[in-house]
From Swiss-Prot:
It catalyses: 4-amino-2-methyl-5-(diphosphooxymethyl)pyrimidine + H2O = 4-amino-2-methyl-5-(phosphooxymethyl)pyrimidine + phosphate + H(+). It comes from the Bacteria. The lineage of its organism: Bacteria, Pseudomonadati, Pseudomonadota, Gammaproteobacteria, Enterobacterales. This is HMP-PP phosphatase. Mg(2+) binds at residues 8, 10, 212. Belongs to the HAD-like hydrolase superfamily. Cof family. The gene is cof. NCBIfam families: Cof-subfamily, HAD-SF-IIB, PRK15126.1. Transmembrane segments: none annotated. Gene3D superfamilies: 3.30.1240.10, HAD superfamily/HAD-like (3.40.50.1000).
Amino acid sequence: MARLAAFDMDGTLLMPDHHLGRETIATLARLRERDITLTFATGRHVLEMRHILGTLSLDAYLITGNGTRIHSLEGDVLHRQDLDPQVADTVMHHAWDTRASMHVFNDNGWFTGQEIPALLQAHVYSGFRYQVIDIKSIPAHQVTKICFCGDHDDLIRLRIQLNETLEERAHLCFSAVDCLEVLPLGCNKGSALAVLSNHLGLSLADCMAFGDAMNDREMLGSVGRGLIMGNAMPQLIAALPHLSVIGHCGNQAVSHFLTHWLDNPHLPYSPE
């Protein structure tokens, strides 16, 4: 039986309205009763995740910023990785040929150059929001990650530009069809989970994980049991064809799967 369960948030644990369902919350509590370590592995900021954890009364480790930070149950930083300052400076100051909006993250919060109210819908549960500032004024040595939000085809073209300019100095991934992230080289949820599991005296084979987007690829592919959401990006399913696909986040599929796993661990699972 797995000893650690790692969960992506958006499109996985959260429902489409960006809330946690009652069944999901109850199932997470059941896992803790079985002494299974909980880990939330997300692109969201730790400041937001602490608020969400506080409303749940659950102990969980946090992998935030898509692996740029790991925090203990007590809130201490176990691991940190920032963008190379030269990379951050280039991304923030270059005139990219794109209509996508740029968003910069550091330990102090989420920063962007203009009001984009539609982006706040994903954060209604926590109330977390961006700060509007001149992005070019942000110190490059304090940047954890940068992301671009916009049309998927536009982001694909932007990814080509970023790859040509940055070469092998950063890790690029889609955390959603409309969000392209620029992360420190070698930084992802999978590498962060490897650091955390080692800290806890576990192996990745002792872990299970759930996800729906390409920023979950390394994590899902490295654990003992990786589960892909039925609403996942097609690219993720194609990249990991050997992994099981469960139901939709709107049906609290993670809870459905885990309830079966806890109650009938030796029986085959069907998402229906």
